UniProtKB/Swiss-Prot annotation:
Quaternary structure annotation from Swiss-Prot or TrEMBL: Interacts with STX17. Interacts with STX5A. Interacts with the COG complex via COG4.
Modified-residue entries (Phosphoserine), positions: 37, 303, 528
Gene, per the UniProt record: SCFD1
Disulfide links within the chain: none
InterPro entries: Sec-1-like_dom1 (IPR043154), Sec-1-like_dom3a (IPR043127), Sec1-like (IPR001619), Sec1-like_dom2 (IPR027482), Sec1-like_sf (IPR036045)
Record organism: Homo sapiens
GO cellular component: cis-Golgi network; cytosol; endoplasmic reticulum membrane; Golgi cisterna membrane; Golgi membrane; Golgi-associated vesicle
Entry keyword Hydrolase: no
Localization per Swiss-Prot or TrEMBL: Cytoplasm; Endoplasmic reticulum membrane; Golgi apparatus, Golgi stack membrane
Name recorded for this polypeptide: Sec1 family domain-containing protein 1
Record's bilayer topology term: Peripheral membrane protein
This protein's UniProt keywords: Acetylation, Cytoplasm, Endoplasmic reticulum, ER-Golgi transport, Golgi apparatus, Membrane, Phosphoprotein, Protein transport, Transport
Keyword Protein biosynthesis: no
GO BP terms: endoplasmic reticulum to Golgi vesicle-mediated transport; intracellular protein transport; negative regulation of autophagosome assembly; post-Golgi vesicle-mediated transport; regulation of ER to Golgi vesicle-mediated transport; regulation of protein transport; response to toxic substance; retrograde vesicle-mediated transport, Golgi to endoplasmic reticulum
Protein function: Plays a role in SNARE-pin assembly and Golgi-to-ER retrograde transport via its interaction with COG4. Involved in vesicular transport between the endoplasmic reticulum and the Golgi.
């Protein structure tokens, strides 16, 4: 039983840890990286393409790279000077143009030795191209290692991953749902998704049991992934799933469940105005790959009349796992975040004053007998204060960071009345009585941008059982056009709804999920950084979104019409027969939900909240691309133009 417990602990070794371990091993010339080794690291350069850069940047900081001996990290296609006495570690996709450039590096004898690591498996023919180039350049002995790393996915959280950031339009919702997509193009999209999912499971060290809905892109992914896993398991000598793949062995003593869902089962959630911190940051700010970019205006004070306003400073902040405030509050409702930032600031000020006081005591002259007698009592205190100084400075950095980020979010909430949108949409999605008419909000010039209004109307249109009459729809369309909205997204959603109506009933979103709590108390203090006047303090009630509900049915083996006809694949079974859902229906302990067609932080947060109530269970959320509502509306608009 102890072994089983240890295996479950290994399951908790998150995908982030596993991918980080794999990267560190690669940077250590594919030898396991030992944390406490005393020797100096071997100095080397890291050469990556944009794909490699996107995989590494959310996981390893520049300081961590330096600790691993990376003195320089350069893009493969940048102009690079020769450094003939230093080894180079390459981390790139095995594309034609990347291979050509690597062969050119060999010919130009840029580095002492070459460790070639491919993000995804390289084909035999491309490998031969490299071998020929090495031969021609008399550099065979310098090519030290060639490795397939199977790391073709991006980990953003301990329990969240996305397929790619570069070329994401290739696997986007629009790409999959284009009416004019050819079979060959669709095959390419599916192969791209399957390649990444295969890499994900190799890194996880587990072969999943796969469930998916029928007649969707998710089913096409399931069929191809099952085949790819099956072929790899059959080739016992070269199987990537035998033995100790990454130090932590198998995922756990029980295999994980992979639930493949199609974006089309729920188009309302990606358009929804949200109320939790991380999802809001993604919705209203420029936030991707865990980095938020803010524009801070440097003001126009004291500038002579008619002078140009000063340029806005761009600032970027990394929101990482070591940021305790972010880890604790990224899923909290926004007013709670504002309150917590304020509390942190006050506790920091108290500590800061203490340090100043102790420092001034130490600086006093000897004549002051009172001060000298206090000195001995205070030495211990001062030592602890000074030793905690770096910690205090880090705390101050995080407080400043979150003050800036939360202030930027708050500006959007107030300027666009996002609390009103959030509350109203929640009522629509949960079929609660609406307190004011939809037309009033659309026609209110002070409530939100044209895009906010379009999002609200689309959610109403998607969620309503009975589509509005033609006359009503014309009235809504006129109000939307008057508000400056582009009607293309509605065009697409109308076609989509007509199509899904034939297929199935619309997704239900459960009962009401918010209750207004009056305005904030603490944060309303005049001393607060955040003037929350007029912003509702809405408290969230846990309510499962469609993706979470589907996962719950399949993970707990519940019988439900929504998921009863989901296909079942077990790549370890000799004959692939999807009708054979096993009779012994044991609930799963670990599951991966993957959304084909794009995901969002609202769904991710909903799953995180759901699993909190399930002891000893783990969930990972993945998606083919991560978009916010603005990016999603743009795709719907392009589809509506067709």
């Amino acid at each position: 039983m102890a072994a089983a417990a240890a295996a479950t602990a290994a399951a908790a070794a998150s995908i982030r840890e596993r991918q980080t371990v794999a990267l560190k091993r690669m940077l250590n010339f594919n030898v396991p990286h030992i944390k406490n080794s005393t020797g100096e690291p071997v100095w080397k350069v890291l050469i990556y393409d944009r794909f490699g850069q996107d995989i590494i940047s959310p996981l390893l900081s520049v300081k961590e790279l330096r600790d691993m001996g990376i003195t320089l990290h350069l893009l493969l296609h940048s102009d690079r000077d020769p450094i003939p006495d230093v080894p180079a570690v390459y981390f790139v996709m095995p594309t034609e143009e990347n291979i050509d450039r690597m062969c050119q590096d060999l010919r130009n004898q840029l580095y002492e030795s070459y460790y070639l690591n491919f993000i995804s498996a390289i084909s035999r023919s491309k490998l031969e191209d490299i071998a020929n180039a090495a031969l021609a350049a008399s550099a065979v002995t310098q090519v030290a290692k060639v490795f397939d790393q199977y790391l073709n996915f991006i980990t953003l959280e301990d329990d969240m991953f996305v397929l790619c950031n570069q070329n994401k339009e290739l696997v986007s919702y629009r790409a999959i749902n284009r009416p004019d997509i050819t079979d060959t193009e669709m095959e390419t999209v599916m192969d791209t998704i399957v390649d990444s999912l295969f890499c994900f499971f190799v890194t996880l060290g587990a072969v999943p049991i796969i469930r998916c809905s029928r007649g969707t892109a998710a089913e096409m992914v399931a069929v191809k992934l099952d085949k790819k896993l099956r072929e790899n398991l059959r080739d016992a000598r070269n199987s990537l799933f035998t033995g100790d793949t990454l130090g932590a062995g198998q995922f756990s003593f029980q295999r994980p469940l992979l639930v493949l869902v199609d974006r089309n089962i729920d188009l309302a959630t990606p358009l929804h105005h949200t109320w939790t911190y991380q999802a809001l940051v993604h919705d209203v700010l420029d936030f991707h790959l865990n980095r938020v970019n803010l524009e801070e205006s440097s003001g126009v004070e004291n500038s002579p009349a008619g002078a140009r306003p000063k340029r806005k400073n761009k600032k970027s902040y990394d929101l990482t796992p070591v940021d305790k405030f972010w880890q604790k509050h990224k899923g909290s409702p926004f007013p709670e975040v504002a309150e917590s930032v304020q509390q942190e600031l006050e506790s920091y000020r108290a500590q800061e004053d203490e340090v100043k006081r102790l420092k001034s005591i130490m600086g006093l002259e000897g004549e002051d007998e009172g001060a000298i007698s206090m000195l001995s009592d205070n030495t211990a205190k001062l030592t602890s204060a000074v030793s905690s100084l770096p910690e205090l400075l880090e705390k101050k950095r995080l407080i400043d960071l979150h003050t800036n980020v939360a202030t930027a979010v708050l500006e959007h909430i107030k300027a666009r009345k996002l609390d009103v949108y959030f509350e109203y949409e929640e009522k629509i999605m949960s079929k609660t009585t609406l307190d004011k008419s939809l037309l009033d909000i659309i026609s209110d010039p002070d409530a939100g941008t044209p895009e906010d209004k379009m999002r609200l109307f689309l959610i109403y249109y998607i969620s309503t059982q009975q589509a509005p009459s033609e006359a009503d729809l014309e009235q809504y369309k006129k109000a939307l056009t008057d508000a400056g909205c582009n009607l293309n997204p509605l065009q697409y959603i109308k076609q989509w709804k007509a199509f899904t109506k034939m297929a199935s009933a619309p997704a239900s979103y459960g009962s009401t999920t918010t209750k207004p709590m009056g305005l904030l108390s603490r944060v309303m203090n005049t001393g607060s950084q955040f003037v929350m006047e007029g912003v509702k303090n809405l408290v969230l009630k846990q309510q499962n979104l469609p993706v979470t509900r589907i996962l719950d049915n399949l993970m707990e083996m519940k019988s439900n019409p929504e998921t009863d006809d989901y296909r079942y694949f077990d790549p370890k079974m000799l004959r692939g027969n999807d009708s054979s859902v096993p009779r012994n229906k044991n609930p799963f302990q670990e599951a991966i939900v993957f959304v084909v067609g794009g995901g969002n932080y609202i769904e991710y947060q909903n799953l995180v909240d759901y699993i909190k109530g399930k002891q000893g269970k783990h969930i990972l959320y993945g998606c083919s691309e991560l978009f916010n509502a603005t990016q999603f509306i743009k795709q719907l608009s392009q589809l509506g133009q067709k």
